[in-house]
């Protein structure tokens, strides 16, 4: 009985060892969708969060292909389509509140989202660039639960 168990034990050990050797990705590429992306840089300049205003951010909701967020003063919303490396925001709209500060940055941010963008995530950063590869926005992630 012991001799018959030895091959089974060796086979089990071998299979467990091989399974442990399979490569696992060290860090998966962060998903564009279903994450809170805080705008931290716009056209090479850091983006400040104004006191008593919402930080500029985007959330791309995968289930309905809707985008929501803030330009810093106004809420923004619309739809989008995305693939492995491009995203296009569509039918973008915003509330129309006036704020004492940050309106220029908000308008630049909203205009920058027009057209097709190239996107890439590295570590906890989302980078958007135009068709020529010029980076215009960087975001940091805050994971949604």
Report each predicted region and the residues it spans.
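N-terminal secretory signal peptides that target proteins for export/translocation
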Residues: 1-3
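Lipid interaction determinants
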Residues: 5-7, 19-145
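Sec-dependent N-terminal signal peptides
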Residues: 6-14
